[in-house]
Amino acid sequence: MSGSKWFDKSLLLRDGVSLISRIWLPNSNGPWPALLMRQPYGREIASTITYSHPEWWVSKGYMVVIQDVRGMGASEGVFNGFKQEARDTSETHEWVRSLKECNGKLGLYGFSYQGFTQLTGELNSKPPDCLSPAMTGMNLSLIHI
């Protein structure tokens, strides 16, 4: 597949930690709706046989953002499992929506840990417009976020 461009971009969180995202854009005039995956396995997981390659989504008119969560991949900080995800997820949603390439619409996708990150966010934050979690077997009421 071709017809898209990608680049890495850093989000500086309020606590000073930097999260790294890889962003794919269509070769057409934006802004576009964004699809976001936040994950701990390295940004390259988004372009394996596990998921449709970001270029496929780009060919459908979406910008795609794949982010390494705190302390994993190229992102800074310490990975503490699920404890930091509500705050980091909310700040990431706000950041993606503020990017000049994004039209303000935000969808989330992924399974397992990537599914979990879709279900977190601070109570006072704006929710995503669409989400698609899968294989996320957890009881969120048992997690103290």
Model-derived regions: residue spans:
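Conserved small/polar residues in nucleotide/adenosyl-binding loops
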Residues: 143-145
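N-terminal cap/lid segment of alpha/beta-hydrolase-fold proteins
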Residues: 1-28
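Alpha/beta-hydrolase fold nucleophile elbow
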Residues: 101-112
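Short amphipathic alpha-helix adjacent to the substrate-entry channel of hydrolases
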Residues: 48-65
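Short beta-strand element of the alpha/beta-hydrolase
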Residues: 31-40
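Glycine-rich "HGGG/HGxG" loop immediately N-terminal to the catalytic nucleophile
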Residues: 47, 71-81
